[in-house]
Amino acid sequence: MTDEQQTPEEYGADSIKVLKGLEAVRKRPGMYIGDTDDGSGLHHMVYEVVDNGIDEALAGHADAVNVKIHDDGSISVSDNGRGIPVGIHEGEGVSAAEVIMTQLHAGGKFDSNSYKVSGGLHGVGVSVVNALSDYLELRIWRNGKEHYARFEGGFTVKHLEVVADCGDRTGTEVRFLASLDTFSNRDFYFETLEKRLRELAFLNSGVRIILTDERPAEHLVSELYYDGGVKEFVKYLDRSKTSILPEPIYVIGERDEIVVEVAMWWNDSYNEMVLPFTNNIPQRDGGTHMAGFRAALTRTINNYAQSSGIAKKEKISFTGDDAREGLTCVLSVKVPDPKFSSQTKDKLVSSEVRPAVENIMNEKLSEWFEENPQIARIVVSKIVEAAHAREAARKARDLTRRKTAMDVNFLAGKLKDCSEKDPSKTEVFLVEGDSAGGSAQTGRDRQTQAILPLKGKILNVERARFDRMLGSQEIGNLVMALGTGIGRDEFNIDKLRYHKIVIMTDADVDGAHIRTLLLTFFFRQMPQLIERGHLYIAQPPLYKVSRGKSEVYLKDQAAMNDYLTEQGVEGAMLRQGNGEEIGGADLRRVVDEAGRLKRVLDAFPTHYPRHILEQAAIAGAFVSGAVEADLQGVADKVAARLDLIANEWERGWQGRITQDKGIRLARILRGVEEVRTLDGPMMRSGEARKSGTFTQHLQDVYNTPATLIRKDRVQNIYGPLDLLKAVLEEGERGLSLQRYKGLGEMNPSQLWETTLDPDARTLLQVKVDDVAEADDLFTKLMGDVVEPRREFIQQNALNVENLDF
């Protein structure tokens, strides 16, 4: 341990202020870290640690953060900042680092000399990460020494000590394994972490963040570094849209220690996206910074339109909605002592932020318009179009309000309503086509279920202005049926007539297209329905299976496989090489285990043949520890297993160790050498580790060839994939299989039994976890620009299964 001398302004041990108590964290973790079941709290653990590194960058002491998901499920975060103070904390009698790790509300962010602004303190700090982890290892590089400490369950098990010299290196590394006592699972999602880390890289220009996932055989690495900051962020958000400006408008300024940074870019769409951040923390519900931005934007554009004569020429006034149509904006403020409406920090309520944002925006944006008159006119012209469209939409809406009794009767002829008037007890099915609508109308529960047939494909609202959308008959019928109205000023979710809105389309390409059109409509025009959990997608069955007089409906391929397995196991017996027989429920368990192994093997890169991976798993090639002890012995066993399953003239496999501690398998076949290699990194990957957990079971069942006996049929079984294939083939014998492509193929009673009956059906609730990513996806799929859509299809084509309709 090193004693430290510090000046009053220095970041040292005495900078750490303490507010005690950790037991409450373990008792009610959700209050401190978020939901412990849906994954958000688990990933928030990582963000807490990452934010400490980012705060070092904000203070000017770091420029690199590394996040690594290790193959054992733990995660490490390191930075090249100053390193957590290691001196003895005067008030606590232990190192400052241990105080930070074991005391709630302990850290340098309470001390204004250490950090002027910080985003990492979500009311908790890294001590909560420690409290909710099986173990946490801390390494600190400071004062030329490497320090190490270990904690378990939030308690110190190895006090901070010097373990090595480190030269000039400085920084901190935290590695932790989340506790299964707190979290229902501890599987980190690479994409979820990448999204948040990308935001941080954009918001902190010049900071390099590297995310590595060591779990797959081929490690995933994402390097996130953006010199352009929020300007690059806006370009990234608009990557699938067509901008009307050559470059984003960029504004930066400071007032009363509040730093305001804004990037704005208008595109040719009709949708607004403004992402507000305070000290790198996103505000889903906006706040005072958003209010200041909107007020300044509307005022500045109106002033420019007046002074340039555009407003007088066009004879129309602009609103804030007009100014923000097609706008993509990132608004980032750095505030010394921000105040939020809740622990989740979803809304900024610091009153001093609004005038700061408003003044900086007014001044800087006015200057920009004066200095760039040609581009300013492009922006104002776009806003003029929006204002004219708004006026046209108002007139169209007035016409809608003046609907006569005949119009309402026309809707009644389309909508087959239910008798229940309590919206919380009712549901409306949006059904593709009149024929399916007829079956649904006859088969439904008339008390609580309404049916609205949709004729043809509804309007693609991604490519249509609001006034044109209001002129669409199908959309008009839908809006009238729901009862909420439409548009920012008219929509009222309290008037929703059905609390379950169920999209029910065919299982073919047209059905998928109609479903996507409807999802686009709800996402763009009625997002509150998705946010409140009112939107669902029906899951009509994909198959009807008949055997004799019995009929079974199966909703998807997984249900089909389960059914075929049950049928194939019935009356079957697996006779092992030692003469023992497995049947009934025991055989079903063996087959299910084979299915689980197949899913693990399918996660390996496709260039590894599945039968070789299967035999390697049986031979024990993926068992941790055993492989390192006798790798050549394992290689010989794998070669012997491959000879076992080969025809006599195709044998001769030989195994040897490769330089990267993998296995090279080779044989001479018809004078040509065939080589297969199990790479060392692959054999130590997360997939290999999972495969190794099956080895004992595999050796118990498949160590010698077995036979599957069913009635008078006998099949040789050399491994779990053989068994799975044989059982599914047995299950298919004597079955008549019908694959439904349209709802109209089912009669009313079938539709009720499979899709409408609340006690038997399956519904998928529509949720949006990432608004920006969802916006980009809808733009790609439904927008005017072809190239991003082509790229999306090319990138995802290989992931499509069952493309047979």
Question: Which sequence ranges carry the predicted segments?
Answer:
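Conserved phosphate-chemistry cores used by DNA topoisomerases
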Residues: M1-F805
